[in-house]
Amino acid sequence: MGKVIGIDLGTTNSCVAVMEGTQPRVIENAEGARTTPSIVAFTDDGERLVGQPAKRQAVTNPERTFFAIKRLIGRTYDDPLTQKDKGLVPYKIARGDNGDAWVEADGKKYSPSQISAFTLQKMKETAESHLGQPVTQAVITVPAYFNDAQRQATKDAGKIAGLEVLRIINEPTAAALAYGLDKKKSGTIAVYDLGGGTFDVSILEIGDGVFEVKSTNGDTFLGGEDFDNRVVEYLTAEFKKEQGIDLTKDKLALQRLKEAAEKAKIELSSATQTEINLPYITADASGPKHLALKLSRAKFESLVDDLVQRTIEPCRKALKDAGVSASEIDEVVLVGGQTRMPKVQEVVKAFFGKEPHKGVNPDEVVAIGAAVQAGVLQGDVKDVLLLDVTPLSLGIETLGGVFTRLIDRNTTIPTKKSQVFSTAEDNQNAVTIRVFQGEREMAADNKLLGQFDLVGIPPAPRGMPQIEVTFDIDANGIVNVTAKDKATNKEHQIRIQASGGLSDADIEKMVKDAEANAEADKKRRELVEVKNQGESLIHATEKSVSEYGDKVSAADKGAIESAIAALRTALEGDDAEGIKAKTNDLMQASMKLGEAMYAASQAEGAPGAEGAAASGEKKDDVIDADFQEVDENERKKRA
């Protein structure tokens, strides 16, 4: 069985880890970094870039560079948060055929699961390169507060990337696993996870290898991206005040501002002031305009104060649901890059009444925890039991549009609950059941997971048929439904077909696209490699011709020069096989030159060789050099 990897699929950055023996290890990507930007871009010629290469070109290609895609995953186009996001990103958010939020570039639509799959593919390749073997299985993390649609969409992303997702695990729970793996002490911990796009808080009890989640809460649209946006808003307002120009309509300028805002935010975690300089940010009739201003930590904190405060209410709710007070928390673990901000640490300390634990790397701890869970599933990690919870209540719509809960939030998963339903009219042969997830009292205010019809009910007066519907939530937090007609004992397994989401056919098509793209990427990489090889050979051959050209015949030299010219012409095109053939021709033509170089180097390094060859005493191809032993004392005298 191959290795199971752990992947933290983040809003801003992603990370991959694997168990090596009893220890988890974060794997560096091809660029040598331990985290990879969750950014996917398409260039003018259709090439797909993932990670750092995509981030580097974002400023010049804002409409085809997709970032923070996790905020759209599993959301409908009409979701108010999708509409809010439309005003925050330079790329186009479009309505998918299934009503979900998709993104668009050059007239082609992509689902958020598909874009996320490209990042997961990069993580998969990173692991394969390190392990030297194919990887087909993974544990992927999601925010604890993700609903069923978001979890299902994440699982779909894994499938599109060619991964069997063995488990979807909550990010704070993964962090707790990583934190508690080597610690023998038991206690109650709070994991405060403020990442690039989402916020979660989980209360866990740890002891004797058991990690039991007591409660979880959060906000799936609160994170570092919002902090960056506040700085961008401030910069555009200041620039408009000073220059009278509105930069919010300029996508190129906005992308530069976003990069500068992120950089300034990071610097202000260690410095009390930073300078933002963006020359040639725009121009008007009077000429080019430059943006230059100082941003203090105090000003930055005032810009984002309400965002930091927004994290406290979920903490309060999580404590209440867990039935503990802040003073009963033994340790507060900080997760997510945004927790490096001093103000965040200050607010957390004030709320929990204790200094937060900073012994874990907030960018890597979630991937490490995912690798630990992968190790548990693979049997490499023993004596670890993880008991997670469902973050949201699950129920159905009943008479009058009321939300009737079947499974309450913070119920330990996997879990199962049955309820008997009946008909509302005489001889009714079908019932529509609408399944919702959320905490509001009216069904319409919660998230519709999907609906299904129970058909073929035998004719009977209303209220007589007994249909037992069983809801169960698996260890991934994903909902399944089974229905059984108690009269006939006939049972139906019903897969909730979400109102949006990807169908099996959609996923299959995207898997094929991903495979085709992987093949195209492989060919593109191969082309780059053969071109590099060809150019290196031309350079080396030309250098050799200038040094040893007089040692070969004019005909041989002419053959080499024409082979160089032919390879140069081939390098201007994109035919990898043609370039390989011309490279081979040049290698063949250069053989005489190689022989001359070898003979010359042999001659230089062998005293007496020239005399031996000139005298004609040896007829062999190999020239024997004369030698004589020299007495050491004699040598010193001569010297």
Swiss-Prot record:
Any GO MF annotation of the entry: unfolded protein binding
Pfam families for the chain: HSP70
Induction: By stress conditions e.g. heat shock.
Lineage: superkingdom: Bacteria
Alphabetical keyword list: ATP-binding, Chaperone, Nucleotide-binding, Phosphoprotein, Stress response
Record's compositionally biased regions (Low complexity): 599-615
First and last residue of the signal peptide: none
SUPFAM superfamilies: Actin-like ATPase domain (SSF53067), Heat shock protein 70kD (HSP70), C-terminal subdomain (SSF100934), Heat shock protein 70kD (HSP70), peptide-binding domain (SSF100920)
Phosphothreonine sites (modified residues): 198
Region feature Disordered, mapped onto this chain: 599-639
Amino acid composition bias (Acidic residues), ranges on this chain: 623-632
Record-stated family: Belongs to the heat shock protein 70 family.
NCBIfam families: PRK00290.1 (NF001413), PRK05183.1 (NF003520), prok_dnaK (TIGR02350)
PANTHER family recorded: HEAT SHOCK PROTEIN 70KDA (PTHR19375)
Name of the protein: Chaperone protein DnaK
Organism: Methylorubrum populi (strain ATCC BAA-705 / NCIMB 13946 / BJ001) (Methylobacterium populi)
Gene (UniProt): dnaK
